[in-house]
Curated annotation (Swiss-Prot):
The gene is RNH70. It comes from Saccharomyces cerevisiae (strain ATCC 204508 / S288c) (Baker's yeast). Residues 167-194, 509-533 form a coiled coil. It holds the Pfam family RNase_T. Disulfide bonds: none annotated. This is RNA exonuclease 1. GO terms for cellular component: nucleus. PANTHER family: FI18136P1-RELATED, RNA EXONUCLEASE REXO1 / RECO3 FAMILY MEMBER-RELATED. Keywords: Coiled coil, Exonuclease, Hydrolase, Nuclease, Nucleus, Phosphoprotein, Ribosome biogenesis, RNA-binding, rRNA processing, tRNA processing.
Amino acid sequence: MQVEGPDTNFVSDLALGSKKRRLSKTSVQEDDHTNVVSEVNKNKKKKKAKPMTCTLLKSVVEKGIGIKDVRDMTQYLLQAENNSPKWIDICNRSSLQKMIVLFIPGLQPDDFENGKNTFNEISDDNFKYIPGEIASTFHTFPVMAPGSKMTLFSPYNSFINVGLSKMEKINKLKELQKKKKITINDLVLSEQQLVANDYPLDSGDTNFDTDWVQTVDFTHGGSHIFALDCEMCLSEQGLVLTRISLVNFDNEVIYEELVKPDVPIVDYLTRYSGITEEKLTVGAKKTLREVQKDLLKIISRSDILIGHSLQNDLKVMKLKHPLVVDTAIIYHHKAGDPFKPSLKYLSETFLNKSIQNGEHDSVEDARACLELTKLKILNGLAFGIGINTENLFTKLHRFEVKTVLLNDMIIKNHTEDDSKGQLIRCVEDDETWTHIHENLNKDVKLIVGRIKNLERSRNYNKKPRKETPSFDASMVLHDIGQHLTQLYENATPGTMILIMSGTGDTRPWNNLSTELEFIQDKKERLDKRREREPEIVEAIKLARGGVASFTVK
């Protein structure tokens, strides 16, 4: 009888089947493990980032917080600065989605609950014009405007100008020195510089009356670069134009006129202007309007005007022009910002010429500005400047932070828009609020704007360009409260809203400084300042005491 051997195929099949089952089981286990890991990772991804929190350190705040400190906090929140502020404890700054900074000059202590006499006494009081449940999320604290016991500087300028470290200054100087050859176009003020220095721009601004004119484009021969200087006398309404001198790039006087004032003169300021009643009576043949017409035939909108603090000349001429070289800006004061060098100092230091000895001469001053500009072109951008500050927005753009700046001094119908920032003209508060609401949920990290109607309603603004419409402070405050409420309700979580007055009550200081400005003799003005020093100190103290309030949704 033959005994058959085992079916090797069958055994193989059994073994293969067993292996397949083991592999299948292992595969399932591995799949299950993979799915579990995947689910865990998914849950980790779904886990929300911790919200940002900001806690005021009152013991530090009470010692004094300035606009600079708020600016540095802004840089830290936007991750353009690694040094955390010492006066506020910030956790999870990476969760910040957007920051809105609003300057609202004109705020007073009694606009807040339990309002005291000064902002220094405020301790987390709520803004009265926001509903309680939202107002309770705001944190209020005093902020000092820049200055000293005898001086007050611009809070807005302090916020938008960042001090540089020693190494940053060295690097900036090296960068400027790279471009050894420059043209006059490299010295023309940028829009942000025009805004920061209060240059009168654009015919559509309702803050300018109908007496203002604007240069227009036209073709002409000869020079396309002019230096300009004016002399002024004092009327009850302020300074008025009484002499104008225009010099071309070849240093030739091409326009020189004494101007008939259209209002009575109360002080000819002869010791400075060189103007006397007799000179004007005999020599002044043209009115301001006629001078404006002459200039519009000489200066095209595409030409360049050179002057020293030229915004003052343009204002008294009631003339708007966009292309300006300002020797008070292209050369720096030895003390740095916010000080501006005098033309006399620049002429003596860089031209080795003594000017303005006694009476001012507008031709001499215009020529000094022209020579200083030519000297700057020969020596490069680094010549005659201090490397102390950088524009906040310029710095933020280097860190890929998208910004929107809303300002009333930007040229009409011009929006500077690139991948990093927008510069939008807003003359009225309604326009500012509209653009803030429109950009609230757009891909923008920082929005900075100024609300002006409150200071107008309370006469905080020192020199309105024309008689502005009257505003009721209570109505303006309710409007501010309504907009802040809407912003909070519509903002995405992680949005910070920060409001700042910038200053305290500036009215007493405005009155004092106006009186002092009318004293043209330097020694007489200094003597008067010493005489009234106690009043000035108190007025400045009141003016520097501002407030800030913020919330994080």
